[in-house]
Swiss-Prot record:
GO terms for cellular component: cytoplasm; nucleus. The gene is UPRT. The lineage of its organism: Eukaryota, Metazoa, Chordata, Craniata, Vertebrata. InterPro entries: PRibTrfase_dom (IPR000836), PRTase-like (IPR029057). Uracil binds at residues 299-301. This is Uracil phosphoribosyltransferase homolog. It comes from Macaca fascicularis (Crab-eating macaque).
């Protein structure tokens, strides 16, 4: 299950329980104190400074200041938000969600896949400037599949009864009908196959949004949806959330077609704190599912995936 980001008002944002024998007890810590964590699989050889925000452990890269990503322009903000910028970013460290206030503002609408070494390796290859296109696409497709499967887990199911080959009655569940996918062209199309691999008959719509050359604002050039999309739950696919402007325009188009924000689940691979915050502020009922929140997003994704870098 994805991790919901919460920061209850009834308790301090920091000083949650830590699974480390060498870590001081919560009573000995003050809000904001760093905790040295020397445990953890392949990362045992390097201590990492961890800030505990709500129920999520957010590790801060050494080269970034703890307040750098909140209320300030990001390195990727110069892009249009289309996720197709040709510039490469420096390989990122662990996820960073900003301060407690950001977590309060975003809340449970932002869900993170549980971090493990497999996901971190895929993220590393995608961010690696020297990775071959073959390795990049292979890793991207694997990460997309993980995000899509967790996205399907957010959809409604209903109980059902089936009969096994031996005549045994088995109580299980099945999807409730009425789901569809919508990809934001062009980088969102990279996620379509991952969705079809999990749902062979699902209908997929498309939106093309680009920045206007004069105003630099996102502009809708094309939109094609299932005719009854207003009755469906929507998996909106866009791998990189930088400014959030492109997604905001896409959601506005969906609303114009009768879709309620509460039935939209945004599937992405990487998000900046600014992008996630902007979307949730505009549409508080939308759900965002991603693998990482970090000030620097790999905005070269679309160009490298489709071989136009």
């Amino acid at each position: 299950m994805a991790t919901e980001l919460q920061c209850p008002d009834s308790m301090p944002c920091h000083n949650q329980q830590v699974n480390s024998a060498s870590t001081p007890s919560p009573e000995q810590l003050r809000p904001g104190d760093p905790i040295l964590d020397h445990a953890g699989g392949n990362r045992a050889s390097r201590a990492k400074v961890t800030l505990l925000t709500g129920h999520t452990h957010c590790s801060l890269p050494a080269e970034l200041d703890a307040g750098a990503c909140v209320g300030s322009s990001l390195n990727s903000e110069s892009n249009s938000g289309s996720g197709d910028s040709s510039s490469y970013d420096a390989p990122a460290g662990n996820s960073f969600l900003g301060d407690c206030e950001l977590s309060r503002q975003i809340g449970a609408q932002l869900k993170l896949l549980p971090m493990n070494d497999q996901i971190r390796e895929l993220q590393t290859i995608i961010r690696d400037k020297t990775a071959s296109r073959g390795d990049f696409m292979f890793s991207a497709d694997r990460l997309i599949r993980l995000v899509v499967e967790e996205g399907l887990n957010q959809l409604p199911y209903k109980e059902c009864m089936v009969t096994t080959p031996t005549g045994y009655k088995y109580e299980g569940v099945k999807f409730e009908k009425g789901n569809c996918g919508v990809s934001i062209m062009r980088s969102g199309e990279a996620m379509e196959q991952g969705l079809r691999d999990c749902c062979r008959s699902i209908r997929i719509g498309k939106i093309l949004i680009q920045s206007d050359e004069e105003t630099q604002r996102a502009k809708v050039y094309y939109a094609k949806f299932p005719p009854d999309i207003y009755r469906r739950k929507v998996l909106l696919m866009y791998p990189i959330l930088s400014t959030g402007n492109t997604v905001i325009e896409a959601v506005k188009v969906l609303i114009e077609h009768g879709v309620q924000p509460s039935v939209i689940i945004l599937l992405s691979l990487f998000s900046t704190p600014h992008g996630a915050k902007s979307i949730i502020q505009e549409f508080p009922e939308i759900t965002i599912l991603t693998t990482e929140v970090h000030p620097v997003a790999p905005t070269h994704f679309g160009q490298k995936y489709f071989g136009t870098d």
